Amino acid sequence: MKKVFNLIIVDESGSMSIIEKQALMGLNETLETVKKIQKAHPEMEQRVTLLTFDSTHTRFIYDNVRANDTHTLSRRDYCPGGATPLYDAIGIGISKLNAQTEPADNVLVTIITDGEENCSEEYNLKMVKNLIEKLKKQNWTFTLIGTDNLDVEGMAGSLSIDDHMAFPEDAKGTTEMFMAGNVARCCYNTMLAEGRPMPRGHFFKNKKGKKE
């Protein structure tokens, strides 16, 4: 059976408190979307890894579990605070999942942040970029979603990430961002089921939301 691994890396730093409610709702909607995809495409096993991070922790809420084994997250699961060790979160997340997958597996990595790297200790930009470039040669697709106060295109380019989207850091913008991401996730899986690879740089094409 074909497997699709959904790695979702979400910033839990203090500044995310502005959109805490919408972020939590959006994460739950994403989990439900993956479950719906599993139902629509039973020939592809959907697995979920959900990682949140700030300067005090890198936490796996889900660690490579079946989509149907996920549950609705509560406010206890997402409590913004601290700084933004973005490189550590990405490096730790993709390195762990890489050890759990085979080269033929399909992996969709979604990175959501409202801030730039400022306190990583284990990984630097070069290390993360090299990891991403290596995994892109397999069936890994990387997406970066950031608030529009950031240079999202520049951040994505520095990490060798082809697909990126910016969104306003407010309730409406956050809600629409998750909607756009979920539509794109469904499209990605439909193309996989049909044996058509998603072209790099086209993940968010024609989806609601602001594409850089």
Predicted regions and their residues:
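Acidic, low-complexity intrinsically disordered regions
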Residues: 1-212
